[in-house]
Amino acid sequence: MPRSTTSAGTRRRFLGPLLIVELILAVMLVGRPDAPSGQPAPVSTPTATAAASRTETVSDGRTVELMSLGGPTTQPLLERVSRAMDDAVAAVTQFWGPDWPRDIIVVATASDEQFRALAGGGSDIAAATTARRIVFAPGATAMSAADLRIVLRHELFHYAARAETAADAPRWLTEGVADFVARPAAPLPGRRLAAEVAVLPTDADLDTVGPTRTLAYDRAWWFTRFVADRYGTPALRRLYLRACGPSHLDVEAAVSEALGADLDEVLVAWRRWLSQIA
């Protein structure tokens, strides 16, 4: 799947106080090798005394390896990740089902150099998911508990779904579904904002820094929420597989097959749904 990002400095409208304060960027790099393309800046390998790892078992029997690459903040961050992991695994499994990797590796880096070497991310990124592991940047320590819960759920969904996600999948839909798994519910935007929200985003919108990207993520999320509310959560999963999986259909055909309705019909119903007063 292509790289996708969420701006660190943008605010997500319509989500209430919890997400209004979200400042940390979460990135998904499914399908990429663990080492980024090109030659990263030289970075020293952590020594055996600096690096440490431990393995835990979550409630469903999956194992989680928590790996610290040294520094004073990585272990406290991993403690927080450990406390949030059961909830994240349960949220992903509730939506996706139990058939996804049983072994999860989470790495906390101590420097921007380490993060770039492992995941290709910059200093404005909190986490990255490669085909093998979820990597947290040093800046992730600034996340609130609510933000960490959202980022971990979001990244873990991408990790769980990576084998069923094509490289050319519509990224706006993969991100919308990941946010459906990760983000808490919020009141409907109402009639005044419905016309602005009820437009399907494009992948190009996700790549446009600023309000365009913020609105694109909101639109994708609201669309997935509508599909789950109107057609059922299993139908949203079917839509993901038909629109984003290997040998996927285009979005219009996938909607018709997964939801049993024409895309235009679905969009009209979506606008009406958004216009409701909660």
PLM regions: where:
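Short, mixed-charge, low-aromatic patches
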Residues: 36-50, 106-112, 132-138, 177-184, ...
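Juxtacatalytic substrate-recognition/specificity segment
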Residues: 52-170, 188-189, 248-251
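Short, surface-exposed loop and linker segments with low hydrophobicity and enrichment for Pro/Ser/Thr
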Residues: 32-34, 93-98, 221
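N-terminal low-structure segments adjacent to metalloprotease catalytic domains
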Residues: 1-59, 278
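Acidic/His/Gly-enriched intrinsically disordered linker/tail segments
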Residues: 129-133, 146-151, 164-278
